[in-house]
Amino acid sequence: MLTNNLTFVTHGTRKLGVRSTYRRILISQEHRFIFHRIPKAANSTIIKTLLAMDPMIDYGSAGYSDSKAKNKFYLHPWDLSIRDSVSARRNFYYFCFTRNPFDRTLSSYLDKFKEGDKRLLKYRKKTGSDEVPSFDEFVRYLEKGGLHEDIHWIPQTMIIPAPKKISFIGKVEKIENDLRAVTEKIFPGASYKGPVNHNPHSTGASGKREIYYSSDLIRRVARLFRKDLRLLGYGWHN
C-alpha cells in the first residue's frame, strides 16, 4: 500500500488515517472515473448500480453476494503509482454522493450505536457506561471530540476534496436523477433503469427525525455540521 501517495489526502485523511479514507475511493481506469464514497450516503445502492451497468463486468456471475465485489473490479489509490494517481485526479470524472447531515448523523447513531458494534464498545470504554446512549448523549459525545473519531459521522466536507475540485456532487435525496447523470457520463450508451437498491444498513433515518430531534438537538447538530450545511446546500427542510 502506497502510504506516501498523498494525491487523495483530505482533512479527514489526516484525522482518520490513509487506510480508513483511501479504501473509500474507487477508481476505474477503463471508464476514467473516481467514486469517492461517503459512508451513510447510499453507498451500497450506488456501487450495486455501477456494477450492474458496467459493460466490462459480467454482473450475472459476479453478483453482489460477495461483499468484496467492488474491490475485484475497481482500484483504490494504493493500487496506482503516484504518477497515475495524479493523472487520474486531474483527468478522470470525479464524483461523490452526499446526504443531509441531520439524516446522516441520525443514521450513524441508529446503525453504529447498537449492541455488539465496536463503536458502542469504544464509547462505553470511554464513558464507563454500560448503557446504550440516547441520541442526545450521542450528540454530546460528538461535541466533546467524538466528531472526528469515525468516518461514518465525520463531516462530509472533511472526507472529500473541496467541492470546486469535484466533477459532480450528487445527493442521496435526488439519487434517481443524479445517479442517472453519473452513469450517462461514465457508461455512455448504457441503459439506465434506476438505482439498484441494496440497503443492508438502512435505518430509515429520514423518516424518524421527529422522533429523535428536539429543537435543541437541531441547533446542536447544525452547529457541528455547519460547514456541510453551507457548502453542500442542506438545511433542516432540504
What are these regions (language model features)?
Residues 1-238:
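Membrane-interface amphipathic segments in extracytoplasmic regions
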